[in-house]
Amino acid sequence: EAGPGDPGLTTILTGARGTGKTALLSYLADEASSRGWVAVNVSALPGMLDEILQQTLRNSSHLIERKGAFKLSGIKVADLAEIQFQSADNDHPTWRIRMEEALGQLAEADAGLLITVDEVREDLDEMVQLASVFQHFVRDRRRVALFMAGLPTHVNGLLQNKSVSFLRRANFHELGVVSDFDIEQAMRKTIEDGGRGV
């Protein structure tokens, strides 16, 4: 990582089914975690943005403080006891504002956030919203990365959307078919690393 704004921090993987896109996203998330980043992994499905926020808060709970959900608003003693609570968050902040708060707390802990999105779909409004908001995170020099993977037709469809022109400057990698020899070598190494022989 060269720092906030590094073009490699926005990466799109494409390839046919079975070329290892999901496995590579998982590997990259594990690698980021081993370097002190918080990694969240989602699929492009409805509810994806909330899932990103919830995973960010959960996976960084050792680094950031969650705001209280309720506050005491009144106590009544006459006619027995009565206690009233109300939501501490009356203003209902947007997804972007809640993510900026989390990113700010992560920055204070000297940690970054990697968001991985698998099975990119051009027909999901939340994909467009994520890409649009992510460019603001980059412009604000947040320590954040976005790695996405999908079939070429879906990725190309997403890139045609006028609202995500930022993604057209992403780092692209097209994954090809893995040869039988490479598969054999990887399996052999995995088995031998596990203390077994072939």
Where are the regions that the model predicts?
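Conserved NTP-binding/hydrolysis module of P-loop NTPases
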Residues: 33-39, 49-85
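Conserved small helical "lid"/interfacial subdomain of P-loop NTPases
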Residues: 175-198
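Conserved catalytic segments around the Walker B and adjacent sensor/switch elements
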Residues: 11-14, 29-48
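Conserved nucleotide-binding/hydrolysis micro-motifs of P-loop NTPases
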Residues: 18, 45-49, 122, 151-156, ...
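Conserved Walker B catalytic segment
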Residues: 88-163
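A short helix-turn-beta junction within AAA+ P-loop NTPase domains corresponding to the substrate/partner-engaging
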Residues: 160-176
